[in-house]
């Protein structure tokens, strides 16, 4: 497996990262070792990643939201998780998990179906998701992409 987790630096950076992916080899001991969650938020923690399954050579997008203990006691949900592919700097949505199962007291997560990363070996992949939280009648929604991309196969 060739897997490269790169910081987002625009289309040129994505092309450079794709070129570097052919020379960088990371061999995790399990599929979960390749997950690198990017998170933010204090009272409500929002996290997302592109997960690599070494056995099947596939990517999938994952997102989760958690009401942090000692925070504001929010209800939370995550929706519209997307796995995006970036061929030549263009964005193409490859998989979507809508996950409209409602509000949750402490946490929610969603995962897209997988895609064969070897079909597009030089493209970078990103995750985007919509995170929502509410307390009483007041609620907030944020759609977020971690400032990272993944290249692999």
Task: Specify the residue positions occupied by each region the protein language model found.
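Post-signal peptide N-terminal regions of Sec-secreted extracellular proteins
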Residues: 32-153
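Secretory targeting and sorting signals
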Residues: 1-33
